[in-house]
């Protein structure tokens, strides 16, 4: 949020000029009453603000002819500006302070038109002039002045005017401070806080994190495993977990799309943390048990997602072997995208674990319980955590390999379908060429017959065998042209990799010895596809023998 704008304060020279004008046009009774209430306003030689050098009158011993009534207090006069009201400029919090302290502590101004005429020369000599008020006096004598200077007034104005905007800005900033919903599990496996909201600043201060660490939890979908001096931060698939030596913090448990897997993880985590660990050498510390629960949940989720993707893919691939349909191809396209996304997700999880395994200093820093007892391990002393991470890394690697095999099966099926479609396209083109050759033969016969039908005199019309001869010659010419075209077309069609039947002959230099390999159960699908391709090729060869 941008900082609140502060209004510009009046300049120093403007304030001095306004003060001089206000004091020059003030009334004498106000200054005199102020001098009577505050003796500090009296001159050093005993003169009051009114300028009288006489000592104060003593009350007469005789009885006074008039008695003063004290029922109502005297009305308090205040200093007012003649041209500009300074109280309208000042904020409310400084008005009383100025009227009671600042204005009464000011020395009597020079140039006052309402002062009494019986002022002493000492007070006139001590009274500052208009030039001194405007430009200041270089010499400072006597005790320090207690009146407010221009800097104090300017600072007070800025603070008063900006305090409201500052309070509003701080309130808006506090309201916009992002919060994270989390569930906390203590060292005994008991849930101490369910769906609680914590500010990011509180998490940073309480658990010793950095702001960039919370950003990876809040806005990043890439798997991360961060090792900090006093915490382990994990962002793996549906889990965003903070592990300490005595507590586990799970973020966004309820209300999210993956609430069910996170709830199942909470039950598994409580079961692992509530197990009584022996004090032997093989016992795992608190943070390792929590980390194992996280990795187990992540790998289980990966396997469940893979099972949900693999079954429809295998089904649609088997259906495409029998019939290539447009709707089936569309379903295969959707499943192919889904499998590719899953493969990428599994690779990211595997890479995150492998990256942690390659960092020896991070592995040694994961012993949080020992750090609380001031025990620090060397960079090569991390056998327990390394074995734990390697076991789950192998599981992730297996899932990635199976996903890669499934993707390769989809790619092979797509290539086979593309080859079949190309073969069908070639068959259609071949049929078109055959019709073109037949049309050419008929055109040749028609061309010969057109000579006989011309309206010209020739000896053929006078004979009895003319019609039969022209018909037979046209037919023979058409057949010859068709036979020649089909022979040339068959030679063009023979441009292929060769006959598969002759390769298995005893004298052939190449022999396929991969039959035993194809009998393996993992390659049965591949063998079935090869047999179907051979049967389809045999059918096509038998249908073309009449040419």
Swiss-Prot record:
The keyword Repeat does not apply. Residues 1-75 form a transit peptide. It is found in: Mitochondrion inner membrane. Residues 46-76, 105-125 are annotated as: Disordered. GO terms for cellular component: mitochondrial inner membrane. A motif (YGMN) lies at residues 452-455. The keyword Magnesium applies. It is a multi-pass membrane protein. Its main location: mitochondrion. Gene3D superfamilies: 2.40.128.330, Magnesium transport protein CorA, transmembrane region (1.20.58.340). The chain crosses the membrane at residues 428-448, 467-487. Residues 52-74 have a biased composition (Low complexity). Homopentamer. Forms homooligomers. Interacts with MFM1. High-conductance magnesium-selective channel that mediates the influx of magnesium into the mitochondrial matrix. Essential for the splicing of mRNA group II introns in mitochondria by affecting mitochondrial magnesium concentrations, which are critical for group II intron splicing. It also suppresses a variety of mitochondrial intron mutations and its absence may disturb the assembly of mitochondrial membrane complexes. PANTHER family: MAGNESIUM TRANSPORTER MRS2 HOMOLOG, MITOCHONDRIAL, RNA SPLICING PROTEIN MRS2, MITOCHONDRIAL. This is Mitochondrial inner membrane magnesium transporter mrs2. It comes from Neurospora crassa (strain ATCC 24698 / 74-OR23-1A / CBS 708.71 / DSM 1257 / FGSC 987).
């Amino acid at each position: 949020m941008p900082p609140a704008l502060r209004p510009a304060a009046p300049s120093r020279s403007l304030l001095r000029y306004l003060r001089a004008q206000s004091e020059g046009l003030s009334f004498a009774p106000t200054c005199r009453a102020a001098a009577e209430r505050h003796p500090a306003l009296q001159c050093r030689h005993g003169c009051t603000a009114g300028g009288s050098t006489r000592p104060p009158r003593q009350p007469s011993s005789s009885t006074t002819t008039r008695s003063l009534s004290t029922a109502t207090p005297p009305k308090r006069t205040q200093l007012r500006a003649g041209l500009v009201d300074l109280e309208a400029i000042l904020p409310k919090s400084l008005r009383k302070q100025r009227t009671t302290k600042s204005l009464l502590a000011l020395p009597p101004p020079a140039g006052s038109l309402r002062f009494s005429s019986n002022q002493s020369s000492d007070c006139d000599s001590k009274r500052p002039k208009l030039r001194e008020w405007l430009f200041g006096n270089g010499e400072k004598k006597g005790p320090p002045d207690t009146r407010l200077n221009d800097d104090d007034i300017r600072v007070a104005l800025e603070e008063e005017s900006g305090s409201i905007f500052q309070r509003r800005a701080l309130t808006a900033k506090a309201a916009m401070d992002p919060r994270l919903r989390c569930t906390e599990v203590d060292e005994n496996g008991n849930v101490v806080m369910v769906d609680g909201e914590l500010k990011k600043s509180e998490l940073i201060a309480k658990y010793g994190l950095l702001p960039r660490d919370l950003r990876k939890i809040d806005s990043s979908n890439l798997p991360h495993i961060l090792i900090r001096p006093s915490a382990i931060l994990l962002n793996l698939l549906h889990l965003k977990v903070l592990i300490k030596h005595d507590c586990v913090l799970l973020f966004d448990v309820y209300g999210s799309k993956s609430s069910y897997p996170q709830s199942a993880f909470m039950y598994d985590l409580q079961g692992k943390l509530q197990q009584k660990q022996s004090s032997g050498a093989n016992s795992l510390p608190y943070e390792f048990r929590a980390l194992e629960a996280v990795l187990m949940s992540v790998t289980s989720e990966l396997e469940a997602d893979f099972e949900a993707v693999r079954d429809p893919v295998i089904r649609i691939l088997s259906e495409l072997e029998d019939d290539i349909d447009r709707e089936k191809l569309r379903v295969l396209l959707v499943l192919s995208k889904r499998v590719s996304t899953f493969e990428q997700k599994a690779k990211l999880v595997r890479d995150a674990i492998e990256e942690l395994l390659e960092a020896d200093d991070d592995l040694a820093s994961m012993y949080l319980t020992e750090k609380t007892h001031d025990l620090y391990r060397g960079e090569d002393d991390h056998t327990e955590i390394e074995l734990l991470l390697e076991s789950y890394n192998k599981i992730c690697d297996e899932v990635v390999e199976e996903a890669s095999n499934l993707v390769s099966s989809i790619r092979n099926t797509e290539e086979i379908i593309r080859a079949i479609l190309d073969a069908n396209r070639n068959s259609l083109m071949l049929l078109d060429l055959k019709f073109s050759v037949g049309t050419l033969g008929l055109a040749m016969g028609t061309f010969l017959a057109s000579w006989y039908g011309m309206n010209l005199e020739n000896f053929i019309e006078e004979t009895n065998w003319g019609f039969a001869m022209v018909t037979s010659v046209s037919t023979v010419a058409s057949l010859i042209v068709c036979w020649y075209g089909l022979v040339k077309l068959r030679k063009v069609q023979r441009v292929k990799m060769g006959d598969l039947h002759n390769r298995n002959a005893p004298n052939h230099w190449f022999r396929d010895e991969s039959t035993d390999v194809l009998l393996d159960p993992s390659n049965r699908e591949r063998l079935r596809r090869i047999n179907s391709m051979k049967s389809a090729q045999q059918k096509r060869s038998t249908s073309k023998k009449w040419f």
